């Protein structure tokens, strides 16, 4: 392969061409987490897995893979996956929205636990949600970013 097509109209998994992004989350309970992302954000559950394969969800233009963790495995011999400590996060999902107040109200009504209400900061308005496993999800609306 000489090149990778980044911009595409389809976000199929597996991709027929180009790439698709999948966000892997290590969770304590795959069923609980799958239904949380379905209820709060409207993610589509594609498969709940079969005990060996993990659940796959589609949320907007990304894929989510939920797994209970474990390891090491032959393809990652020194890596163990575990649910995060909710007070020590090293990465998080960032959802960009057109109307943060509307998303805040809708997702809160669906059970999202927001750490704060939306707050203006650094050219955007943002807030954070904590999911059932302690992951934080940034929700942001750009207020100063210009395209073109």
Language-model region placement:
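Vicinal oxygen chelate
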Residues: 2-22, 44-95, 104-130, 141-148
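Conserved beta-strand-loop-alpha-helix junction that forms the acyl-donor binding cleft
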Residues: 27-30
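Conserved catalytic-loop position in the HRD/HxD motif
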Residues: 99
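Conserved active-site tyrosine of GNAT-family acetyltransferases
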Residues: 33-38, 107, 134
